[in-house]
A protein has these predicted regions:
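Alpha-helical transmembrane segments of helical membrane proteins, especially in multi-pass transport
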Residues: 55-82
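Juxtamembrane boundary at the C-terminal end of a transmembrane helix
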Residues: 133-149
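Juxtamembrane inter-helical linkers in multi-pass membrane proteins
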Residues: 35-51
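Short aromatic-rich membrane-water interface segments that cap or initiate transmembrane helices
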Residues: 1-14, 48-59, 86-94
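Short alpha-helical packing/oligomerization segments
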Residues: 79-104
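Hydrophobic cores of alpha-helical transmembrane segments in multi-pass inner/ER membrane proteins
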Residues: 10-28, 98-107
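Interfacial loop-to-transmembrane junctions
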Residues: 109-130
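Transmembrane alpha-helical segments of integral membrane proteins
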Residues: 72-79, 100-114
Length: 149
C-alpha cells in the first residue's frame, strides 16, 4: 500500500532529521564549551562556526518536525483504513504523537522567546534523548502492532 510506504518514509526521515538536529546540538554545546575554556582541540579546528552549526540544527529540526508530522498523519489515516480506528491505543503511537506535540511546543517557545545558541542546542539534544528513551521504554513495557520481524 503506498500510504503505508509514505508513512514509513516520512516518519523515518522525521526521526532521522531530529536525531541529526540533536547531534548538531551536542556538537554546538561541546564546541561552545571548548571556546569558553580557550582550549580548542584538533577536532574543533575543522568545525564550522557556531552560527552555522546552529542554523544546520534549526533546519534539520524543522525538517524533522514537518516530516514526522506528515508521517504521523499518514500513519493515522492508514490505521483508520486497516484497523478502523484513527487513534489506536498503542503506546508507540501515543509516544510519537506526544513527542511531536512537545517538539511543536518547543519550537513555539523558541520562536516566542527568541532562543538561540546554547539554549537551543540543549533543548534539541535533551528533547531527542527523552524521545528516544521513551520509545525504547515502550519497546520493553508493552507489545505493539509495530513489530518488525
Amino acid at each position: 500500500n503506498p500510504i503505508f510506504g509514505i508513512h514509513v518514509f516520512l516518519t523515518l526521515v522525521g526521526i532521522s532529521a531530529l536525531a541529526i538536529s540533536a547531534i548538531y546540538g551536542l556538537i554546538y554545546w561541546m564546541f561552545a564549551k571548548q571556546i569558553k575554556s580557550h582550549n580548542l582541540g584538533i577536532i574543533y579546528r575543522g568545525m564550522p562556526p557556531l552560527d552555522q552549526l546552529e542554523s544546520m540544527g534549526r533546519l534539520s529540526s524543522i525538517l524533522g518536525l514537518v516530516s514526522l508530522g506528515f508521517g504521523l498523519i499518514t500513519g493515522h489515516f492508514y490505521a483508520y483504513r486497516v484497523l478502523g480506528e484513527l487513534f489506536p491505543p498503542d503506546l508507540k503511537i501515543i509516544i510519537n504523537d506526544a513527542a511531536w506535540i512537545f517538539y511543536l511546543l518547543g519550537w513555539t517557545i523558541v520562536k516566542l522567546k527568541n532562543y538561540s545558541g546554547l539554549r537551543l542546542s540543549k533543548l534539541s539534544f535533551w528533547g531527542f534523548i527523552a524521545f528516544a528513551g521513551a520509545i525504547m521504554a515502550a519497546n520493553f513495557i508493552s507489545s505493539s502492532f509495530h513489530q518488525f520481524n
